[in-house]
Amino acid sequence: MSNPQAERLVTFLIENGIQDQKVLDAIYLLPRESFLSQAMHHQAYDNNALPIGQGQTISQPYIVAKMTELLELQQDSRVLEIGTGSGYQTAVLAQLVDHVYSVERIKSLQWDAKRRLKQLDFYNISTKHGDGWQGWSSKAPFDAIIVTAAAESIPQALLQQLKDGGRLLIPVGDDEQQLLKIVRHGDEFLSSVIEMVRFVPLVPGELA
């Protein structure tokens, strides 16, 4: 069954430079309204970040697509997400790889996302309530790490949890934020600036 709103969104993403067909398909197939409150359903396929409670947001589809594309994922890529939030980005990733690990510092968001993802028949996702600054060392190393909140500086724990050749996508900064792509080469980390972005802050610690 076709979804005209999702088709319009995918057309918008293509017009704005998203080229990876697997990423476009993952976004087309995912019902974004399932990750939003009933009051937000009419905006589900707009290219906007929307509130999900606890001062957090679901990222705009463009930035989800852009960051996912930049991770250069293969089916067997080991992926860590920092900031589960609603679970939307998690679900996009889970359509592209065998397994996704995701850390969320706010317990209620983690539980809601876990329930929502199971309802949507995603069983290749492991979520954890914890401090995103620390990553998930027991599951490391990772081929790709994606951070969905802005850090004041790059968390060293995340760099150390990258495989050689692994990619880290992270927004860095306070009010003025840059989306960085960092690639590990042995003990060196090569960083490139992708574009200016606006994310909620990556706060250390965890909330019950």
Swiss-Prot record:
Assigned protein family: Belongs to the methyltransferase superfamily. L-isoaspartyl/D-aspartyl protein methyltransferase family.
Signal peptide: none
GO cellular component term, pick one: cytoplasm
SUPFAM superfamilies, A to Z: S-adenosyl-L-methionine-dependent methyltransferases (SSF53335)
Function: Catalyzes the methyl esterification of L-isoaspartyl residues in peptides and proteins that result from spontaneous decomposition of normal L-aspartyl and L-asparaginyl residues. It plays a role in the repair and/or degradation of damaged proteins.
Coiled-coil ranges (or none): none
Chief site of localization: cytoplasm
Domain of life: Bacteria
Top-tier EC class: transferase
Stored CDD domains: AdoMet_MTases (cd02440)
Residue positions of the active site: 59
GO biological-process terms attached to the record: methylation; protein modification process; protein repair
UniProt protein name: Protein-L-isoaspartate O-methyltransferase
Key words, A-Z: Cytoplasm, Methyltransferase, S-adenosyl-L-methionine, Transferase
Cellular localization per UniProt: Cytoplasm
Record's catalysed reaction(s): [protein]-L-isoaspartate + S-adenosyl-L-methionine = [protein]-L-isoaspartate alpha-methyl ester + S-adenosyl-L-homocysteine
EC number: 2.1.1.77
